[in-house]
């Protein structure tokens, strides 16, 4: 994502340990005296995206100025979870292991590119500890594009499928979406739309993140210059502390302590019809 610094300390090419290496470490964990039978997170920052995105990447390196998944998946992308399923099964098969969880890092857009549902079904059935954390970040497609994220309809498609498979498995599980306020491009109107989306879905986030710049990222360039370095166009930036407070409050509109801020934001946006 454009606001993420992971590529700077892990590299742009996704690299993974072998199944044998992960299993060896998991086995060491099972031999610890306080091990209770649970392996709590199998997968790196991209969890299910374990290897290079395409054959070209393996020989020529990553593409300049092109993302593998956003705004739309590259036609050369190879989306295959079969090796990841093999890894999960290998860890599950270890003596003393009761359950293997995937806590976060799932790339839901990559999952939807896989023509097979095998991993999706296995994830829902075997590897969610009540809640799965994913990162749609926003619902405004204009903001999402500046973030380097897929359109919101991709998350909605994932969300629908996740809950459908959960019901088919006879389980009660939830999604915890990571959300961000005040990213470059996000206006008060954008935050109001996100609040309406949360209300529609009946979701009240316990935590939200207000954007802050991290060195070297495209989003940081937008924040300091007001220009998108990827196309040279001007970008609105919420730098005023009070406006950032308003945007953040809208994402947690249901909290009594945010009431006055939410009312002020709605008045500024001409949406007094939403004041309750």
Annotate each language-model stretch with its function:
Residues 1-18:
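Canonical Radical SAM [4Fe-4S] cluster-binding loop centered on the CxxxCxxC motif
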Residues 15-28:
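Conserved S-adenosyl-L-methionine
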Residues 22, 134, 208, 270:
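Conserved, mostly hydrophobic/aromatic
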Residues 27-176, 180-184:
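Conserved SAM/AdoMet-binding glycine-rich loop
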Residues 43-45, 212-217:
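Short, solvent-exposed turn/loop segments enriched in Gly/Ser/Thr/Pro and often Arg
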Residues 118-119, 183-200:
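Catalytic cores of alpha/beta
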Residues 203-214:
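Glycine-rich phosphate-binding active-site loops on the catalytic face of alpha/beta enzymes
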Residues 216-276:
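Radical SAM enzyme core and accessory elements
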């Amino acid at each position: 994502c454009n606001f993420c610094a992971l590529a700077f300390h892990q590299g742009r090419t996704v690299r993974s340990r072998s199944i044998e290496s992960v299993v060896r470490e998991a086995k060491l964990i099972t031999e610890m005296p306080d091990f209770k039978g649970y392996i709590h997170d199998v997968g790196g920052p991209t969890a299910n995206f374990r290897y290079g995105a395409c054959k070209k990447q393996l020989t020529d390196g990553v593409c300049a100025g092109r993302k593998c998944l956003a705004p739309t998946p590259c036609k050369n992308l190879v989306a295959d979870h079969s090796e990841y399923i093999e890894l999960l099964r290998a860890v599950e098969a270890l003596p003393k292991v009761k359950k293997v969880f995937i806590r976060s890092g799932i790339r839901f857009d990559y999952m939807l590119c896989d023509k097979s549902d095998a991993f999706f079904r296995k994830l829902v059935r075997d590897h969610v500890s009540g809640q799965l954390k994913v990162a749609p970040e926003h619902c405004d497609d204009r903001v999402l594009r500046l973030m380097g994220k897929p359109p919101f309809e991709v998350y909605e498609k994932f969300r629908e499928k996740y809950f459908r498979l959960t019901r088919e498995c006879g389980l009660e599980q939830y999604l915890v979406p990571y959300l961000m306020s005040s990213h470059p491009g996000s206006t008060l109107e954008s935050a109001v739309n996100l609040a309406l989306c949360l209300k529609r879905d009946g979701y009240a986030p316990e935590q939200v993140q207000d954007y802050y710049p991290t060195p070297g990222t495209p989003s940081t360039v937008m924040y300091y210059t007001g220009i998108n370095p990827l196309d040279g166009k001007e970008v609105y930036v919420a730098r005023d502390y009070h406006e950032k407070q308003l945007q953040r409050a809208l994402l947690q509109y249901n909290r009594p302590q945010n009431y006055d801020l939410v009312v002020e934001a709605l008045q500024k946006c001409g949406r007094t019809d939403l004041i309750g």
